[in-house]
Amino acid sequence: MQLFWTPASPFTRKVVIAAKELGLWQRIDVKPTTWPLDWGYATVPFTAGLAAANPVARIPTLITDDGVALGDSTLICQHLNSLATDTRVIPTDGGQWPMGALYAVADGLLEAQVAMRAEMLRPDAIRSAGFLQKQQDRIRRCFDHIEEHAVELSVPGGSLPNLAQITAGIACGYQDWRDWLADFRPGRPALSNWYGEFSQRPAMRETEPSDTPEA
């Protein structure tokens, strides 16, 4: 398998953590991508092969062993989950629906964080304060919801985290990494305590975000 990726993308981090937790990371050939800082509002040169594999030209994109291009992090994680032999990050016993409900909120939180990042990269003259406030409000609501459902974040001993837990952890980590984002911890003690422990998982520590090369 081949993965187009960037170390800054929380969606890429989701795929990498899922692969590591499932023991599949060694089967993936990583293809780094570069993104000029105007990626959020302009068409930029794409890393060779990315747009050909995925016309959306979005990362992460995974080329499967069968040559199928999967250009969505959720779809990629579903594929990786299907390759696992005994443990899963997406339940197959009916538990996928409660997990999926929390996952959708955590994934929407990532979308709001990245949307803010793209808007922050726009020149001041065309940056929308209203759009930024909309994303901040969405982020706050999502973190509040995850705090209210913090009991669902607990990973039983000896088990793998599910995709909702992985994505919630990534959202917390992204909020910490971008210094223009507010601290998610005040007023959310359960989420704060959970993340303090979850962030120490090897797959989390090995995938801490860093800036993407511009060229």
Describe every region a protein language model picked out.
Residues 1-129:
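GST-like domain detector, emphasizing the conserved glutathione-binding G-site
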Residues 77, 81, 100-103, 143, ...:
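Non-transmembrane alpha-helical segments in soluble domains
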Residues 84, 150-153, 202:
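A general structural signal marking secondary-structure boundaries and capping sites
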Residues 87-92, 155-159, 184, 205-210:
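Short, hydrophobic secondary-structure boundary micro-motifs
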Residues 106-196:
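GST-like fold's C-terminal all-alpha helical module
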Residues 183-215:
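Long hydrophobic alpha-helical segments typical of transmembrane helices together
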